[in-house]
Regions:
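Surface-exposed amphipathic alpha-helices with a cationic face
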Residues: 1-2, 31-34, 49-57, 108-120, ...
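N-terminal amphipathic alpha-helix/helix-capping segment at the start of soluble metabolic enzymes
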Residues: 1-21
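Catalytic cores of alpha/beta
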Residues: 71-85, 129-143, 176-180, 184-195
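Glycine/Thr-rich beta-alpha phosphate-binding loop at enzyme active sites
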Residues: 90-104, 130, 135-166
Length: 195
């Protein structure tokens, strides 16, 4: 975490329905991000993670977005996606840590202990929507908390992003690293996040 602390992590992701969808393009975007001063990359799918790691020597936060009909969770929702990401050797794996039902019917409180048991040495980032999610994630043994999903879940829809009140409260109460994520588009917002 020391390599990314206090720096900008750039998300290099494109879904199949988007014009820049290609592992080669995401790798070039990661290269451009590094040239621009990024200290880390957030990437979706094992293929993109592999391509990006070949292109840049920055830490990669890997995730795998998959839609399931029976769950709102789409960021690394099941063990199947975690297993797939592990083949790409990311530095960190991000997964939805909200208190919603996963595709297999489990919650983060029952799912994450299984993940940690299977991959005890991996660094895991909790993508959270609320203060409560972040504190729960720390208690469950996540290594990093992110404000990724604030404003994107039914309970937080309509919340102004970036979610500075949530960020401030988590920064005071967490003992693990916190990543401000989501809705940071302007330098002033970034400065406020670091304040």
């Amino acid at each position: 975490f020391a390599q990314i602390k206090g720096g900008l992590i750039v998300s290099c992701q494109a879904l199949e329905t988007e014009p820049l969808y290609s592992s080669k393009i995401m790798a070039r975007m990661a290269f451009a991000a590094k040239e621009g001063g990024a200290v880390g990359i957030r990437a979706n799918t094992p293929e993109d993670i592999i391509a990006i790691k070949k292109e840049v020597d920055l830490p990669v936060i890997g995730l795998y977005k998959v839609d399931y009909d029976n769950s709102e969770i789409y960021i690394t929702p099941t063990m199947k996606e975690i297993d797939a990401i592990m083949t790409a050797a990311p530095d960190i794996i991000a997964l939805d840590a909200t208190n919603r039902k996963r595709p297999d019917g489990s919650t983060i409180e029952t799912f994450f202990p299984e993940v940690r048991k299977k991959y005890p040495d991996m660094i895991f980032m909790a993508d959270c929507a609320s203060y409560e999610d972040g504190m729960r994630a720390q208690k469950l043994g996540f290594d990093i908390v992110g404000t990724t999903l604030c404003g994107y879940t039914p309970d937080t829809k309509g919340t102004e992003i970036p979610c500075f009140p949530m960020l401030e409260k988590l920064a005071q109460d967490l003992t693990i690293p916190l990543i401000a994520e989501g809705g940071i588009w302007e330098p002033q917002q970034l400065q406020k996040a670091f304040a």
